[in-house]
Swiss-Prot record:
Superkingdom as given in the UniProt entry: Bacteria
Residue ranges constituting the PRC barrel domain according to the UniProt record: 90-163
Organism: Oenococcus oeni (strain ATCC BAA-331 / PSU-1)
Record's GO cellular component terms: cytoplasm; ribosome
UniProt xrefs under Pfam families: PRC_RimM, RimM
GO function term, MF aspect, one: ribosome binding
Name of the protein described by the UniProt record: Ribosome maturation factor RimM
InterPro entries reported in the protein's UniProt record: PRC_barrel-like_sf (IPR011033), PRC_RimM (IPR056792), RimM (IPR011961), RimM_N (IPR002676), RimM_N_sf (IPR036976), Transl_B-barrel_sf (IPR009000)
Protein family (similarity comment): Belongs to the RimM family.
One GO-annotated biological process of the protein: rRNA processing
Keywords from the UniProt entry: Chaperone, Cytoplasm, Ribosome biogenesis, rRNA processing
Originating gene: rimM
Length: 166
């Protein structure tokens, strides 16, 4: 069964076994809900509790009552089984579906491909790796991202002034 990456453990939080997670999912409330099963470092863990914290989520797992039991997860990616994907409406997509998509401008010129996505307080930001190896960051907002086409594996953007320094 395929696994989807939904975040990374950034650090521990306090001494009671909570982990600070940088999430990479549009559904953190569902992904980190009580009794959800997550995979970290090859281990299946069950969420005991979770809560938003600044731009992160704090998650505590069953049978992991103190910091000593969770320190080993620092820096580890967090996965779910693909079968647990939520149903999406027309025009919606998962972050995992856009990684690797070709990025073009409105004239069809190639810009690069999506290498990563991360959440900020205001909106998501996509990292685009250009053919010359440089990376640019674009906000996922209507003024920039014009079309996401999963069928053709392309994203059309309007590259506003200042987004690409080349």
């Amino acid at each position: 069964m395929k696994e989807l990456r939904i975040g990374r453990v950034i650090n521990t939080h306090g001494i009671a076994g909570e982990l600070k997670i940088d999430f990479n999912t549009d559904f953190p409330e569902q992904r980190f809900a009580k009794n959800s099963e997550l995979l970290i470092a090859g281990e299946k863990l069950v969420v005991q509790s979770s809560r938003p914290f600044k731009q992160f989520w704090l998650v505590k797992f069953s049978d992991h009552e103190n910091i000593n039991l969770v320190e080993k997860y620092k820096g580890e990616d967090i996965f779910i089984n693909e079968r647990k994907e939520p149903r999406l409406s027309e025009g919606e997509f998962l972050v995992s579906q856009i990684i690797g998509l070709k990025v073009i401008d409105e004239k069809g010129n190639s810009i690069g491909e999506i290498a990563d996505s991360f959440h900020t307080g205001a909106n998501d930001v996509w990292t685009i790796k250009k053919s010359n190896g440089k990376e640019i960051l674009i906000p996922y907002i209507d003024q920039v991202v014009k079309k996401v086409d999963l069928q053709t594996s392309t994203v059309t953007i309007e590259l506003l002034e200042g987004l690409d320094e080349d």
